Amino acid sequence: FTRLNFFLDNYDGAFRLSIDTMNKNIAKYALDNNFEILNDVSGFREPGMIELAVEKSSKIILVHSHPDASHIQEKMEFKDVVQEVKAQLEIKINYLISKGIKESQISIDPGLGFGKTMRDSEILFKNLDVFCFGFPLVVGYSKKKFTEILNMTNYQLYTHCIDSGAALVRLHIAS
């Protein structure tokens, strides 16, 4: 917990905190220490993560992860990446709700770059509006290889996300 403790020791409460982890123990520690949002890039596959989110009533970011992938970076084949990712997110949302997660806890992220080719991520990025179907949309394009083929400035990438309905855009900004 060293990295978390360093951050928490210097946190002044000025903004909401989200933890990006697949590890239940780290997630629990973070939620016990002022973090409000659980972002699990595995799509909440790890044992105990769903139960923890239910117990803590934490907001969650459901990142798309192909159900047949053995790990989050395994490249999967899609016939229609937009429709398949949307359908898989809908199935996972229904599963989470059946396990006690409330709709109001859920935000969705199409998982750009996770288990997808650069072309798949490009297509998803160009069709972000499809993922605005009743849940806040979170987009993380920053530092992703596929953005190189879009030939857009960072401002244009960000504006596209907002214009497409994103509620939150995750960025990496160096100081």
Regions found by a protein language model. Give the residues of each.
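Active-site-adjacent loop and "lid" segments of alpha/beta metabolic enzymes
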Residues: 1-17, 24, 31, 36-90, ...
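Phosphate/pyrophosphate-binding loops at sites that engage ATP/ADP/AMP, CoA/4′-phosphopantetheine
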Residues: 90-105
